[in-house]
């Protein structure tokens, strides 16, 4: 929802970056990224707008089905045999169990607009107090010296 519904349009399409997204790790860490981004300063401001985007989008009362299906698709992608082996290796190394996978799927399928809206405030705190790292040419990151 955030990566393709908001960041892609604001940072990739309008801002000209080659790519962008948001990721939430199982330990609760949240990070946003862009790459080959000609306007890093704008992208940082866009990341700060994620809570408002969520609030506005979810207030429209749209069905959650497409969002849930898209999320399941990212957690259970179609894979060839080599991809299955790679995924199982990663799960083994991370200690991810079948019970973990089932729990995550239940949480995804049980997602509601209200539950997503509750994430807006922690994301707002992240945007206001989070750390960032910018790697680029001297001109691309000159705004950091302001």
Residue ranges of predicted features:
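C-terminal regions of mature proteins
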Residues: 68, 72-146
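Non-catalytic beta-strand/loop surface segments
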Residues: 1-46, 106-127, 146
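M16/insulysin-pitrilysin zinc metalloprotease superfamily fold
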Residues: 22-79
